[in-house]
Amino acid sequence: MDDLLDLGEERRRSSATSGAKMGRRAHQESTQAENYLNSKNSSLTQTGEAPPPKPPRRQGGWADDSMKMAKLGKKVSEEMEDHRLRQQNLMGSDDDDIPVIPDLEDVQEEDFVLQVASPPSIQVNRVMTYRDLDNDLMKYSAFQTLDGEIDLKLLTKVLAPEHEVREDDVGWDWDHLYTEVSSELLTEWDLLRAEKEDPVGPSRYI
């Protein structure tokens, strides 16, 4: 029993001493490293050499993030397009659905410049003029009767010639037209007044 207690105390002592030794050694190593760095810096300052410059640190902002997101989105869209095209190729892999493109030798060259569309053919009845009607009335006696029963000779005798009926195309002027109409109305009113004032006929008693 005493032996066991002695062994436990020795273990405690050995562990305490070993922990202290390790702490001292570690402290010694750290002090040695600091001394080495201090001596190196002092030697550099004595010789006049500057320490090497630090490499530039790359800094990114929101633009880098947006470029990364754009590249990522483009990659995802390309993958989706490839997947869709693969599915279409698998679905349309039948030989019956493949269109046949004719060769250029089989296609006949046609000169479309020389091909002119034909004009439409429309039957238009020619309208007769007054002169044609007059000539027909004078030449052909058949036109002097309507439906073989009505005689049109009396009508053709009293028809006025064309030069009497035709009027010249004259532009209307408002002032000229107003004076002309007003003068005609005044003359008519004067005639009516004269008829009212004068007796209608010769007097019975003379």
From Swiss-Prot:
Polar residues compositional bias, start-end: 29-48
One Pfam family per UniProt: IFT43
Tissue and organ expression note: Expressed in the retina, iris-ciliary body, lens and cornea. Higher expression is observed in the retina, predominantly in the photoreceptor outer segment.
GO CC term (a single one): ciliary basal body
Subcellular location: Cytoplasm, Cytoskeleton; Cell projection, Cilium
UniProt keywords, alphabetically: Acetylation, Cell projection, Cilium biogenesis/degradation, Cytoplasm, Cytoskeleton, Phosphoprotein
GO process terms (BP): cilium assembly; intraciliary retrograde transport
Annotated region described as Disordered, given as residue ranges: 1-71
Major place of residence: cytoplasm
Positions carrying Phosphoserine: 77
In-chain residues carrying the UniProt-annotated modification N-acetylmethionine: 1
UniProt subunit comment: Component of the IFT complex A (IFT-A) complex. IFT-A complex is divided into a core subcomplex composed of IFT122:IFT140:WDR19 which is associated with TULP3 and a peripheral subcomplex composed of IFT43:WDR35:TTC21B. Interacts directy with IFT122, WDR35 and TTC21B.
Function: As a component of IFT complex A (IFT-A), a complex required for retrograde ciliary transport and entry into cilia of G protein-coupled receptors (GPCRs), it is involved in ciliogenesis. Involved in retrograde ciliary transport along microtubules from the ciliary tip to the base.
Stated family: Belongs to the IFT43 family.
Protein name as it appears in the record: Intraflagellar transport protein 43 homolog
Biological source species: Mus musculus (Mouse)
Lineage: Eukaryota, Metazoa, Chordata, Craniata, Vertebrata
Gene that encodes it: Ift43
